[in-house]
């Protein structure tokens, strides 16, 4: 097979002084950070959909890329060619993982029978390529939002036949993910929401999607899938309002249906932007609620109101992300999936390398800065000092349920309390962060 990226042999670490645009300047996979290899901290993955399925089309223009697997011809053979090139890319980029939707890797066909056949064929192709290359599957998922049948949602659709079709896709994709050794399975409700409340029964749709997720959990245990189930929050787009709005909303949903011990979250930076949150907020919230699982590493444009899915390039933003992840003990089954696409004008095939190399270097720099913050521990100490009172007798009585409003009122009166505000020292904390971002 002729190489598609014939100008590149393999992307390697060459250090910060390198001028080679096809080399890592900061991502050194074998460098030890806090007792663990950098590669094991970051667990990078390439997104099959944006990298190999998007053709450069947007709302105002047709596709601008000329990818050989996107030409006319036998759909299944083109899917095999796409897999060849995808694994060439993974290996030359030296990335350990990839992620996919079912219809990213295999043509959907014109019937359920064709879908199942095509998916089975390509699953076998990917299994062989994983065996040959050592590249692994971080997570799989099913696309239950693109086809016109899902115009009113999948699990929340008013037609139970559509619900059943979606269940078939998820059933098949979960089985394929298990077969391929996937470490997670993701559920993103692209159209699980509404465009108008005039034709929407909120209670009915919530019960439907709750039952759907319960069935997903049941199937996970039935087939013995050892990976983590993940829901990916997003507030809107393509619908006006989506039920998995943000991390806190997803947690409330999981609690309602008794799933908070079964499902975690896959947090995407750009989705946090759309929800009016910082990426830092969503990661910290997921950690605080005990549902942090994985990350879609990208960025949005604060001046635009849609999901731009750009590659991450802010060391400042991502240092705080990696700091939260390190404090929480790091990834277990999750990782950093680049749910990002090159710009429509970036039509050179090698732009795919520039995008991923830059993003991987960005996250490597962020990891190193976050590790310095962990080792220094001053930020953590200042936060602990701020809440130290809660470790005392009064604080513990309150938290342990041994105090009431009445007893606290008596305490305040008998001790003639006159508490004074203590400085939050935000500026000092920001200076501490900058000290580790720019150590020289």
Curated annotation (Swiss-Prot):
It is found in: Cytoplasm. GO terms for biological process: D-xylose metabolic process. Keywords: Carbohydrate metabolism, Cytoplasm, Isomerase, Magnesium, Metal-binding, Xylose metabolism. It comes from Pectobacterium carotovorum subsp. carotovorum (strain PC1). Binds 2 magnesium ions per subunit. Belongs to the xylose isomerase family. It catalyses: alpha-D-xylose = alpha-D-xylulofuranose. Mg(2+) binds at residues 307, 309. GO terms for cellular component: cytoplasm. Its EC number is 5.3.1.5. This is Xylose isomerase. Homotetramer. The keyword Cytoplasm applies. It is an enzyme of class 5 (isomerase).
């Amino acid at each position: 097979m002729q190489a598609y990226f014939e100008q590149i042999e393999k992307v390697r670490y060459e250090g910060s002084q390198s001028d080679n645009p096809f080399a890592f300047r900061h991502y050194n996979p074998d460098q030890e950070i806090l007792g663990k290899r950098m590669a094991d901290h970051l667990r990078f993955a390439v997104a099959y959909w944006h990298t190999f399925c998007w053709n450069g089309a947007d709302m105002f223009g047709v596709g601008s890329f000329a990818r050989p697997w996107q030409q006319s011809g036998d759909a299944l053979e083109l899917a095999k060619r796409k897999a060849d090139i995808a694994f060439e890319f993974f290996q030359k980029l030296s990335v350990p993982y990839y992620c996919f939707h079912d219809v990213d890797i295999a043509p959907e066909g014109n019937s359920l029978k064709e879908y199942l056949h095509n998916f089975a064929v390509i699953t076998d192709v990917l299994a062989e390529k994983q065996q040959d290359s050592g590249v692994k599957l971080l997570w799989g998922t099913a696309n239950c939002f693109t086809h016109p049948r899902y115009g009113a949602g999948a699990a929340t659709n008013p037609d139970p036949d559509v619900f059943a079709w979606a269940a078939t896709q998820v059933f098949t994709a979960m089985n394929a993910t298990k077969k391929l050794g996937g470490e997670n399975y993701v559920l993103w409700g692209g159209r699980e929401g509404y465009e108008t409340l005039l034709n929407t029964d909120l209670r009915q749709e919530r019960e439907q999607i709750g039952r759907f997720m319960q069935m997903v959990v049941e199937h996970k245990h039935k087939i013995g899938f050892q990976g983590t189930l993940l829901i990916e929050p997003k507030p809107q787009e393509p619908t006006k309002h989506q039920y998995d709005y943000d991390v806190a909303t997803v947690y409330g949903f999981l609690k309602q249906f008794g799933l908070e011990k079964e499902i975690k979250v896959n947090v995407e930076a750009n989705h946090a932007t759309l929800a009016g949150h910082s990426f830092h907020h969503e990661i910290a919230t997921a950690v605080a609620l005990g549902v942090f699982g994985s990350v879609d590493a990208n960025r949005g444009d604060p001046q635009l109101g849609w999901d731009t899915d750009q590659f991450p390039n802010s060391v400042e933003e991502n240092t705080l992300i990696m700091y939260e992840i390190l404090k929480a003990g790091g990834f277990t089954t999750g990782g950093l999936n680049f749910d990002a696409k090159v710009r429509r004008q970036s039509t050179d095939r090698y732009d795919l390398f520039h995008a991923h190399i830059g993003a991987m270097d960005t996250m490597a720099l962020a990891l190193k800065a976050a590790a310095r913050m962990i080792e220094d521990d001053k930020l953590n100490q200042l936060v602990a000092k701020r809440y130290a009172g809660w470790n005392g007798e009064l604080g513990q009585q309150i938290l342990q349920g041994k105090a009431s409003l009445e007893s606290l009122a008596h305490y305040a009166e008998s001790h003639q309390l006159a508490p004074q505000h203590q400085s939050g020292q935000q500026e000092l904390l920001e200076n501490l962060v900058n000290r580790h971002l720019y150590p020289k």
